[in-house]
Every structure is written in C-alpha cells, then in structure tokens.
Amino acid sequence: MEFRKDLGQYIYEYEGLIFAWDEEPEEDIQNTVESLAENYFKNLDVIIDFMLADIKEIYGEVTVEDVKEKLGKPVIDYNNGKVTYYEQSFDDCHIFEFEFMDDAFEDLQYFSIDG
C-alpha cells in the first residue's frame, strides 16, 4: 500500500487492478481486494455491456473486445463505490467512470465519459 499524490489516495495494486482508499485502511484488506478482483473479472462483460451504448455514441461502432483492449487499468475506489479508467485508449482526453452499488459488480449506475 502506498500513497499516490497524483490520485490523492492510498493505492494497492492486485492482478492488474488498482484499489484506492481516501484514508489508509486500518484493517487487513487482502480478502476484500481478492473478492473485488474476482467479481470484477467475473462480471467484466456485464460491466462493458453497461458502458457500451455510451461508448458507441462517442466513438462509433466498437465491440466488447475492443472495449476490453482499450479500457486500461481500472482504479477501484472502494470507499466511494466508483471505478475510474484514467488510462483508456479510445482517446487521450477523456476519463471513463461508473458507480457500483455492491461488491459483486452487479448493480452498476451512472456511467460517464468526462474530459
């Protein structure tokens, strides 16, 4: 776990995912991180389907596989229930973000493309 000034958060990287907290967690986070990573990868197609219409609206016809290749590393902000893609490669000026309401990544809301 390290503090990243560019994010203003404590981060922990696991299996290609970045987990972020506003304050350094006091409890052991390994089980939480492992569970979130498993659920994120298990539901990645559902997550992409949730975002796909908005992505197509801006970037044209893209497939689920295109999105998988271009999303980059997600930053999972556990305290705020947000996943942010700062490194997406559709362009160099937008940030993708959505909110998750449960640790299973089954209840997703408020996808946005900001920039």
Where are these regions (language model features)?
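Amphipathic protein-protein interaction modules
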Residues: 42-96
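Acidic, proline/glycine-rich low-complexity IDRs
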Residues: 1-14, 66, 77-115
